[in-house]
């Protein structure tokens, strides 16, 4: 039977002076995330903004937190350094509820980019509000290197040899680790945290990069397949 994987929504908020559909609150999914999950024959369900998260956690086999808007600094006890970095508190609250519900149901959770930051904040961690060297308009073409932590889960998946290339676009980054989290990878050469994993029961793992954007033709690139397979295997093993 195909696995049923929930994906948290990106939110588009109505803009002043907008017309038509842009006057509405929109829940949406970046299709590359769906394609990545569909490549392993999983069924993909975007979870709309709602108050029934426990029911979704009961019915679905796992959760992926997709990328998108900043985490509001208010979520980790800080004020935004700039007004435009206020983030999306509505989405923050909803995704924290999702992480809590799926974790309580012992369902695996995988965070991508913003999802890694959200998991860290949900567990009491903090963020660097601005990391300009990791922010770029190149979007899914921006590549930098990461080094996997020796002995980590990712090192067991991929081996520990040398820096590996990933697609990573963000201007926030994990600062202080949340509860029961360990570092799985760091950016090279600046050492920012790029991947985390829970040391507690169940599967809770997150990467700051975008595995769904990986280029299979890049010989030095980190193949997204093993990470996806590990997550889906955790969903099957429940």
Predicted regions span which residues?
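Active-site-proximal beta-strand elements of phosphoester/diester hydrolases
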Residues: 205-208
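N-terminal beta1-alpha1 cap of cysteine-dependent amidohydrolase-like domains
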Residues: 1-108, 121, 128, 132-158, ...
